[in-house]
Every structure is written in C-alpha cells, then in structure tokens.
C-alpha cells in the first residue's frame, strides 16, 4: 500500500510542476513570513499575489497575525491550513474567522484523534462564516498558479498516541524554490514518509515540533537535504528547544538555520531561483518595541503570579494579557502601571494570601505538571514568561 502511495505522490508532485534547480526561474519570488510569537506557529506564505496562512498561533497571538496581514497589505487569504489540533497552532483561527478577512478555502488534515469533527477548530472557524473545511489526504494537490502548488505528503495514517504525528505535511513547489512545511511532525511521522518514499529535496525546511530532540532523523534529513531551515520556538517557554542535537545535525549538512526567537517581530525568508536569497529581521511599522524589564514569578502552591518591573521607568501593562498554558486560561489586564521596582500580585479564587487582584478561576496554575505563564502585549507578542518549576 505504501509503495502504491509513493507512486501516486511522485506523480502528483510531477503534475504539480516540481522542477529542477537548473530550470527554476530567477524572476519569480516566494516569501515565508514567520512570526516571532513564542513557541506557537504562524506562517504566511506568499507567491505571485497569492497568500496562504499555515497555522494561527495561540488566541493571544491574534494581534501579531492581524498586524502582519495589515503590514503586508493582505486583505484576502487564498487558503488557511491548520496542521493539527493543538492550541498553539489553532488558537487564532476563530478570531481570524471573525475578522471579516475573506478566506477562499479552509484546509485541515483528514486524520486526527480525540476531537469530535463538530468541535474541530477548523470546522468551528469555517462554520462561523457558513463555510466548510476541505479535508486533505496524502497525494492531494492544491494549485497555487504560476507553476506553483502544495502537495500533501502526510499524515499517512492516524496516530492515536501523539497528535503531533497527525500533522499536515505540505510540500510547496514553485519556480522560485520549494518549502517543506512539517507542522509539529516528530520522528514517527518522519519515518512513515521516509518508508513511503514521499520525500524529496527542498530549498527551505520548516522543522517539526519546534526543533526538539524528537525530530530530524538522519534518514529524513538525507532525503530532504534543505539549503536552509527555520525553527519556530522560544527557549524561554520551552527550554529543550531547539535541541542542540537538532542544530548540530543541520549544521553538519551545511544547512543555514534561522530561529523565530532571534528576530524582533517576524522573520521574512525569500526564495528565488531555487535558492534562499534573503532572511530579513522584520520590525512592524508604527508598533512600539516590546517592553523590557518586566518579569513573572509563579507560585503554584499559593496559586499566584507576581509581575515585577525591574527597569528604571514606569511600565504600562494596560491591554496586556496573561496566559496559563496548561489550561489556556487568560486574563486581560486593564489600567495597570508598574512603577520602577514595583510589583503586582494576582491570585485565583482559592488563593488565601494577600493579592492585588483576583483572577476569576478556581485554580489558575497547575500544581501537578509544568505550566508556563506568558505575558502578551496588545500586538500579540510575548514579552516575558516563567514556569511553575515542575517537570
């Protein structure tokens, strides 16, 4: 069955116009805008006046996505792809649907688990507009135009142990170059694609699962041989990413590596003539720089979070949002200004110590598993984070 699928995928990619580097034109250009929104994923692929969104980050990142679309004059999306059902990928979908920005097509993998179809985040977003989701399977091709297309490589089968391994894997091919988009794919799904013969070399690789140590097997890298790779992550939020082993493997094959956390607002990667011709650190026009000097401290036993201003100037946190990633509970701050050296303590409904503000939740912070608190500014950008000290 997998041999048959490999043949079908090869035919699909030929029909889609996959061409050699020697035949690629230097006239066309493809760009991948990778937002620096912490560990969450949100990518905007643009080619010949078409625009395609791959994932939408957390709900709290909507301000960043909205800003990106505005700054690049994107008033219509040709397609929105949800790679899989995790909140750091689908969180912004509903706000996008409610924004009024036209979306020509909503796409998601036909394979997932542990979510009823009626509650699937892509279904909910599309249905809020009276629209439907196009379910994708390996071998499907989405034409882009001007010699470009997306080919669906995976998933090949449902994985009921880890939703990351149900990630929609897309191969974008164009005269400008090719991009392999992996969602949060880990080694298990990588090996499915290797065994099926689904993979081919790419110009740019968007690594799976934030570049952790359960991605990029040697056999996978030998097939895709990227010129460059981009990793969407935040070491502050997820200390094990990117893994040293991941960075070493990419370096060993001569692959240039870009990390979203190393840019300011976004990273714009440009492909032309079958090569990566640019990787620009983007700063939003007319948007203030991220604040500095504010820290978080979580006490999961007391169920409190303390915000401190360690800078020498007052800091306004009006309109900022706090997120607890374990339960994805959020709290919007209003009218709060921290003086130099000042602090603000927020507790849940069951907190017994003295606090400055009550978060209307019984238990905000997990006292059993690792929970990360993130403070987002009004433009959807994380400005600081801290965990609860648990594994």
Can you name each region flagged by the protein language model?
Residues 23-76, 135-201, 266-293:
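Core dinuclear metal-dependent hydrolase active-site scaffold
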């Amino acid at each position: 069955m997998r041999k048959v699928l490999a043949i079908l995928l090869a035919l699909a990619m030929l029909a889609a116009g996959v061409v050699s580097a020697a035949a690629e034109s230097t006239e066309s250009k493809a760009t991948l805008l990778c937002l620096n929104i912490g560990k969450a994923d949100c990518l905007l692929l643009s080619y010949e006046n078409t625009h395609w969104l791959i994932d939408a980050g957390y709900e709290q990142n909507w301000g960043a996505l909205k800003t990106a679309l505005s700054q690049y004059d994107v008033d219509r999306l040709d397609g929105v792809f949800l790679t899989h059902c995790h909140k750091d990928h689908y969180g912004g979908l509903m706000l996008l649907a409610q924004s009024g920005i036209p979306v020509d097509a909503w796409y998601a993998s036909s394979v997932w688990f542990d979510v009823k179809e009626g509650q699937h985040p892509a279904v909910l977003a599309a249905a809020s507009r009276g629209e439907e989701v196009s379910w994708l399977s390996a071998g499907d091709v989405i034409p882009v135009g001007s010699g470009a297309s997306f080919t669906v490589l995976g998933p090949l089968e449902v994985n009921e142990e880890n939703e990351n391994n149900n990630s929609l894997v897309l191969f974008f091919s164009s005269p400008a170059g090719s991009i392999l988009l992996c969602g949060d794919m880990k080694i298990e799904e990588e090996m499915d694609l290797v065994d099926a013969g689904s993979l081919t070399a790419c110009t740019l690789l968007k690594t799976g699962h934030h570049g952790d140590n359960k991605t990029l097997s040697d056999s996978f890298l030998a097939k895709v041989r990227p010129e460059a790779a981009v990793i969407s992550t935040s070491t502050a939020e997820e200390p094990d990413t990117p893994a040293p082993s991941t960075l070493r493997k990419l370096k060993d094959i001569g692959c240039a590596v870009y990390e979203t956390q190393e840019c300011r607002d976004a990273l714009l990667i440009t492909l032309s003539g079958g090569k990566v011709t640019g990787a620009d650190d983007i700063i939003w026009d007319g948007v203030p720089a991220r604040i500095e000097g504010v820290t978080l401290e979580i006490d999961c036993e007391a169920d409190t979070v303390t915000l401190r201003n360690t800078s020498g100037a007052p800091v306004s946190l009006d309109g900022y949002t706090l997120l607890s990633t374990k339960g994805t509970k959020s709290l919007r701050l209003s009218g709060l200004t921290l003086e130099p050296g000042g602090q603000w303590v927020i507790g849940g409904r069951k907190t017994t110590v003295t606090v400055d503000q009550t978060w209307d939740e019984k238990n905000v912070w997990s006292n059993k598993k690792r929970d990360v608190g993130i403070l987002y500014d009004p433009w959807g950008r994380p400005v600081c984070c801290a965990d609860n000290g648990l594994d």
